[in-house]
From Swiss-Prot:
Species in which this protein is naturally found: Homo sapiens
One of the Pfam families matching this protein, by short name: PQ-loop
Name of the protein described by the UniProt record: Solute carrier family 66 member 2
InterPro entries linked: PQ-loop_rpt, SLC66/Scramblase_ANY1
Topology of this chain in the membrane: Multi-pass membrane protein
Segments passing through the bilayer: 8-28, 49-69, 76-96, 145-165, 168-188, 232-252
Length: 271
């Protein structure tokens, strides 16, 4: 009798918690990038952030949206993908603008310091998506090139999905590729840190938020009975996040000593 009397409170409370979890699922994924975005804007330096993180998330979330057409899953996960795509495009726009501005400033300083009046400013060649140069893939000079690449990938992947949507094997494979790609999210940052033997320029807050967010996301997948691919993705992401935090701890304890007479090129690209 008492349990029935509490239904008027427990049912709305359960609904409120469910809505809160869904909202956290939709918007929580973009929160880790807020401190990194602010750091880049404040310092006007994007060297510490690997733009390949954006590439991984764009591919993963586009594939996840296409997977939804073959196997419907919860709406919050679908909205999360759409918002994450917009967020990654904003990150790419900022990183591209900052990198190009820094390269231009470096050329201006070089020209001003030149002793010869006849010396000309050496303008770096513009790199474009339409050049189809694999050596400069994802290192283009204009944000519009990234947009063209994303649209081209979406169009091709969407057309293939349209032709194969009736194949259960294709749909499950598509879902697996989506979550496997997302599980590799931290790998570009992990590799960059290993290559430079430093986490300088990387936002520790961002990685901590990655870890907490991925742990929450994995628990959400398990509790909501999401497709198995999602849970596997979440567990792999947590492991990669912990590896990056381990790098930050190790490099802080044993910082790399700068080599004598080392030349530090301006505008070094992350990854």
């Amino acid at each position: 009798m008492e349990a029935e009397g509490l239904d008027w409170l427990l049912v709305p409370l359960h609904q409120l918690v469910s809505w809160g979890a869904a909202a956290a699922m939709v918007f929580g994924g973009v929160v880790p990038y807020v401190p990194q975005y602010r750091d880049i804007r404040r310092t006007q330096n994007a060297d510490g952030f690997s733009t390949y993180v954006c590439l991984v998330l764009l591919v993963a979330n586009i594939l996840r949206i296409l997977f939804w057409f073959g196997r419907r899953f919860e709406s919050p996960l679908l909205w999360q993908s759409a918002i994450m795509i917009l967020t990654m495009l904003l990150m790419l726009k900022l990183c591209t603008e900052v990198r190009v501005a820094n390269e231009l400033n470096a050329r201006r300083r070089s020209f001003t310091a030149a002793d010869s009046k006849d010396e000309e400013v050496k303008v770096a060649p513009r790199r474009s998506f339409l050049d189809f140069d694999p050596h400069h893939f994802w290192q283009w000079s204009s944000f519009s090139d990234y947009v063209q690449c994303v649209l081209a990938f979406t169009g091709v992947a969407g057309y293939i999905t349209y032709l194969s949507i009736d194949s259960a094997l294709f749909v499950e494979t598509l879902g697996f590729l989506a979550v496997l790609t997302e599980a590799m999210l931290g790998v570009p940052q992990l590799y960059r840190n290993h290559r430079h033997q430093s986490t300088e320029g990387m936002s520790i807050k961002m990685v901590l938020m990655w870890t907490s967010g991925d742990a929450f996301k994995t628990a959400y997948f398990l509790l909501k009975g999401a497709p198995l691919q999602f849970s596997v993705c979440g567990l792999l992401q947590v492991l990669v996040d912990l590896a990056i935090l381990g790098q930050a701890y190790a490099f802080a304890r044993h910082p790399q000593k700068p080599a004598p007479h080392a030349v530090h090129p301006t505008g070094t690209k992350a990854l």
